[in-house]
Regions:
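Interaction-mediating elements
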Residues: 1-123
Length: 123
């Protein structure tokens, strides 16, 4: 169950209204998880500083089970950097991606058919 938490100092009005859906789709395609399992939360207008600058930036935390590794992460980074820099109109130097490897048992969720189809992903 991938969980993506995005903090940015970009104003809500400057981010597309379907940004969360686009993030969920990109994560689904990139790490090969069903779209129905992906949670996205975006906090806009945060007070943020990075490298001494308050220029537009984003900090993206991505938690998921059984996908992140030292070998896989660089490939994910290339895809996520391309996506987020275009979607948020920021340079790669203003984007921080933080991968968190978790276990399925780290999530407390209740998922039942027919709404949730991929039982193999649930504890």
């Amino acid at each position: 169950m991938p969980k993506i938490i995005i903090h940015t100092n970009i104003k809500d009005a400057d981010i597309s209204t379907d940004f969360e859906e686009k993030v969920a789709l990109k994560v689904s395609e990139t790490i090969n998880y069903p779209l129905e399992l992906i949670h996205v939360s975006v906090t806009c207008g945060d007070r943020m500083i990075h490298n001494g600058s308050r220029a537009p930036m984003a900090f993206v935390d991505i938690d998921t089970a059984n996908k992140f590794s030292e070998d896989a992460n660089p490939g994910y980074t290339v895809k996520f950097q391309e996506f987020f820099t275009k979607a948020l109109n920021i340079p790669a130097s203003r984007l921080i991606l933080h991968y968190h490897a978790t276990k399925g048992s780290d999530y407390g969720v209740s998922r039942q058919p027919p709404e949730y189809k991929h039982a193999e992903y649930y504890v």
